């Protein structure tokens, strides 16, 4: 699947290839995964201790306002303000294996 326009900002820091971490962790297989568990990436303590799973409700909130969902996380992105972009990015993340 082609990445939606809303994903442009994500790919500045995130790869979609398994095992290829950048400034942020690879997003391959992220949908359904527990937050802070990908190997080879140094997550912030708040991220690791969040206990979140990247499902649709969690991603919907996180992509719109990451700092409220996980206060103190390292991601500098302020969030996607358009709900349609959030939905499109989540649908795209579901396709990444």
From Swiss-Prot:
N-terminal signal peptide: none
InterPro entries in the record: Cyt_c-like_dom (IPR009056), Cyt_c-like_dom_sf (IPR036909), Cyt_c_1A/1B (IPR002327)
NAD is among the record's keywords: no
Alphabetic keyword roster: Electron transport, Heme, Iron, Metal-binding, Photosynthesis, Transport
Cysteine disulfide partners in this protein: none
Residues reported in the UniProt entry to bind heme c: 10, 13-14, 75
Role of this protein: Cytochrome c2 is found mainly in purple, non-sulfur, photosynthetic bacteria where it functions as the electron donor to the oxidized bacteriochlorophyll in the photophosphorylation pathway. However, it may also have a role in the respiratory chain and is found in some non-photosynthetic bacteria.
UniProt protein name: Cytochrome c2 iso-2
Species annotation: Magnetospirillum molischianum
